[in-house]
């Protein structure tokens, strides 16, 4: 491979009304916004009706381009919007520009260590993720290989996928390998809400028949007692797993939940966990049967591959959160990634559409319940050049002064 260096890092947000990596940033009606879905803010009446009421989509997408001195451009994305752009352009760029892109481990470690005073989780790691993914895209393009080949090659010819959706009946007809539906009500809704949750799952099971796997996404909304009570009530419908019931830092709660639900259903979590250190806690405390890191948030591919490798030593499956082309490459390359998630992002959950909206060209979509990746170099997707992107800190000097 020819000798190259990284010449520039550019961080963008999307124009108003564009979705990108933030799937909550919808215009018009949409099931993920308009249905009652339990969430951490459901305990407050004024924020119960919609997740967007409390600003879940306030920051939006960050899109990163990493350009090499030979003109190669790699792309990566996450959430975090303008604040993430600021971190990338003002702070992280100094550890990236001028580097050999093959030094991805060194670059990641320097970004991680430099953000420890204000980072460790959340926004800073999301910013690191976007940069890291863009570097891996560059590496694939330089070598003329897909990213999964850089990780050791494909362990499967195609990747089975399940649907996250409000319409499990349609997902079943499409050939998906199961469906995950949102938990509608939480502890603040009392026994009446519990009865409604049971009714929703009963209807789903009736629609799809006895053999189609069903899962429940609880989005950090429950308590340990409520989650145990709910899971036991749903056992009659052969619930396969209950997902992210508790706030991500409640490791003791997850361990208690897993012990209580052994033999009833699987416990999964990790969507809002960050870095291998967070997942080490989940593993060491026996918090989950399945781990669910999000490659666009957890630290990018460099960190996600460490997490998957660590999980394999404990015979733990990893089923990443989100239907991201980036995570598909990770899952292609590891044997302990048995199935992928696909978010059905059409407004009525009745069409298969790209997760990232119009952001990318050639985003892979499932057919008959499987994703098949090509041998296109890098991530195999290209930025849609007709989409309006805004670079909020383009004029920022690298020494930290905005001109």
What function would you assign to each model-found segment?
Residues 2-21, 25-49, 323-403:
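Flexible C-terminal active-site loop/helix
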Residues 6, 71, 92, 131, ...:
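Conserved, mostly hydrophobic/aromatic
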Residues 39-69:
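Active-site-flanking structural segment that lines cofactor/substrate pockets
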Residues 44, 232, 238, 249-370, ...:
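Shared catalytic-loop signature of beta/alpha-barrel
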Residues 50-52, 67-142:
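Metal- or metallocofactor-binding catalytic centers and their adjacent structured scaffolds
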Residues 76, 161-164, 177-181, 214-218, ...:
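Hydrophobic faces of well-ordered beta-strands that scaffold small-molecule active sites
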Residues 123-126, 132-168:
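Glycine-rich, aromatic-flanked loop segments that form ligand/cofactor-binding clefts
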Residues 152-257:
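Metal-dependent enolase-superfamily TIM-barrel catalytic cores that perform enediolate-based chemistry
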